[in-house]
A protein has these predicted regions:
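Alpha-helical multi-pass transmembrane bundles of energy-transducing inner-membrane proteins
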Residues: 27-32, 117-121, 125-208, 293-306, ...
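Juxtamembrane/interfacial segments at transmembrane-helix boundaries in multi-pass membrane proteins
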Residues: 55-77, 176-231, 235, 260-278, ...
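Central hydrophobic cores of alpha-helical transmembrane segments in multi-pass inner-membrane proteins
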Residues: 8-24, 38-51, 92-104, 122-124, ...
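Transmembrane helix-loop-helix hairpins at membrane boundaries of multipass inner-membrane proteins
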Residues: 1-6, 20-117, 192-200, 487-488
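Alpha-helical transmembrane segments of multipass membrane proteins
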Residues: 18-23, 49, 98-102, 124-128, ...
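Structural signature of hydrophobic alpha-helical transmembrane segments
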Residues: 2-13, 82-93, 135-148, 209-222, ...
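Predominantly late transmembrane helices and immediately cytosolic-facing juxtamembrane segments
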Residues: 227, 346-350, 416-449
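C-terminal ends of transmembrane helices
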Residues: 19-27, 97-109, 151-160, 224-238, ...
Length: 498
């Protein structure tokens, strides 16, 4: 019985839990709010596990589908479904949300109930965006999740939190207005807002495809974010609380890349081929130039934020590598796998920075040094996650990058060579930060007073370490889920609509 409503449960359990936590009200009831938030996040995660275990890896199309009329007059429906791509993102989102609730357990003292509730509600809305099969439903969830994210940064962020949250909101909202117009145009072509109907339009002139591409691309490129519309992300990360940075990097950025897979590539394949060289150049700029920018950062959060832009450039590169008019198999699957890996690794890196910030209240690299002498367990975890961020073999960070490089070399040797620069820059800025923060002599008396990670922090980092190593050592568990959906997308994009 419940299997018919798993996606609805994955959406509405976190939202309902968030409302319940919000109802606890005053800070004096913070212990109750934390327990309810944990139970809600745990229930939200557990309900996604049957999606993974029950997913038919050999079957194409959408599974766990639901359909209910919402606004019949406009043919807007509550339609849900997942394929091998979206199912992984829903599970990742629920997983990270659970860890974020634990990460803020003792740290957030100001309005903890509202803080936890914002994350739970945002988690449900993000799941809705990944599961939506109706364009307007997708738009509602896609834009709705901005509200709790705006509040998380604007209320619990750093000194410049208002500036960062407004910048985030304006960038992402303005980019989405044209997408709504494009959806209305597609509605008039199909007679419905069904995303599947959009994808199955037989004929769209190239000029129209290019206009639609521009409308959708602006919205999704800002969310990824791609160069040059990336400037909101470092500010948002620096000002966001630890949990906000974890979700922003691990989940929110993936919504933009997911939009490329769900809308741009299948609906506008000819325009995607036409603009692919431009996307490849912008992606390589993100990989190389933004990697160089990360090298000169003095703030740990800002360094990892630029690292995220560089890694997401790798993702968009993999999505737009065409060979003889067809998407490259290795590169596309590698891009999807890289997104899942980046979810684990980026969340872990921001958690590590948060652990140090909670003790020393600074993110300046120069204020640290010799941390390994007082926090050896923490230093070991940060080394693992740093190496995964650099793409070390046997970690999750290597798998997707290697697959994209394989696909890039098949398209053009020099594109592959330039893409491989991410491994060099990733190692450079990660080791540069690690050496100055973790190794060396203690020259700050406050560092000497730092305590090693507690049981709660150890549990969070250990869970993320298992995910990073598990995916690195046995990536097939993830690749086999993605395989059929990626093949279906490749076959669909190969058919011209001119």
């Amino acid at each position: 019985m419940f299997s018919n409503y798993l996606l609805s449960l994955a959406i509405w359990i976190p939202i309902a839990a968030g409302v319940l936590v919000l109802a606890t009200g005053k800070d004096s009831r913070a212990p109750l709010a934390r327990v309810l938030a944990f139970m809600g996040a745990l229930a939200g995660f557990l309900v996604t596990l049957p999606l993974f275990t029950g997913f038919d890896r050999l079957s194409g199309g959408y599974q766990f589908t639901e359909f209910h009329e919402w606004i019949p007059l406009l043919k807007i429906n509550y339609a849900l479904g997942v394929d091998g791509i979206s199912v992984l993102f829903i599970i990742l989102n629920a997983f990270i949300t659970l860890l974020v609730v634990l990460a803020g357990w003792e740290v957030i003292q100001k309005r903890p109930a509202q803080y936890m509730a914002a994350f739970l509600i945002m988690s449900g809305l993000i799941n809705g965006a990944f599961a939506a099969q109706d364009a307007i439903l997708f738009y509602v969830f896609f834009e709705g999740m901005l509200i709790p994210l705006y509040l998380i940064i604007g209320v619990w962020g750093g000194p410049r939190r208002v500036y960062a949250s407004v910048k985030l909101f304006l960038y992402t909202l303005m980019g989405s207005l044209l997408m709504l117009v494009a959806m209305v145009y597609l509605y008039y072509q199909t007679g419905s807002f069904s995303i599947v109907d959009f994808q199955n339009i037989k004929q769209i002139p190239l000029g129209v495809q290019q206009l639609l591409f521009a409308a959708f691309f602006l919205s999704f490129a800002v969310k990824v974010p791609m160069f040059p519309v990336h400037t909101w992300l470092p500010d948002a990360h620096v000002e966001a609380p630890t949990g906000g940075s974890m979700v922003l990097a691990a989940i929110t950025l993936k919504l933009g890349a997911y939009g490329f897979l769900r809308f741009i590539l299948p609906i506008m394949p000819d325009a995607a081929r036409y603009f692919a060289p431009v996307i490849i150049v912008l992606s390589l700029i993100a990989v190389i130039y933004i990697g160089m920018v990360a090298l000169v950062q003095t703030d740990m959060k800002k360094l990892v934020a630029y690292s995220s832009i560089s890694h997401m450039g790798f993702v968009t590169l993999g999505m737009f590598l065409f060979v003889n008019g067809q998407l490259n198999d290795w590169a596309l699957k590698g891009a999807i796998v890289q997104m899942i890996s980046h979810g684990f690794v980026s969340a872990a890196m921001f958690m590590c920075i948060g652990v140090m910030y909670d003790r020393l209240h600074t993110r300046n690299i120069a204020d640290y040094g010799g941390v390994v002498n007082v926090m050896p367990k923490f230093a070991a975890f940060m080394m693992l996650f740093g190496m995964a961020n650099a793409g070390l073999p046997a970690t999750s960070g290597f798998v997707g990058e290697f697959m994209v490089i394989m696909g890039a070399v098949k398209v053009n040797f020099w594109v592959g060579a330039l893409a491989a620069m991410t491994l060099i820059y990733g190692a450079s800025y990660t080791l540069w930060m690690y050496k100055r923060v973790i190794f060396g002599a203690i020259h700050n008396l406050h560092v000497a007073e730092m305590k090693d990670i507690n049981c709660r922090e150890f549990a969070i980092l250990a869970i993320l370490a298992v995910a990073v190593l598990g995916m690195g050592l046995y990536p097939q568990a993830f690749i086999e889920v993605v395989h059929q959906a990626a093949n279906d997308l490749i076959a669909h994009v190969a058919q011209s609509k001119i």
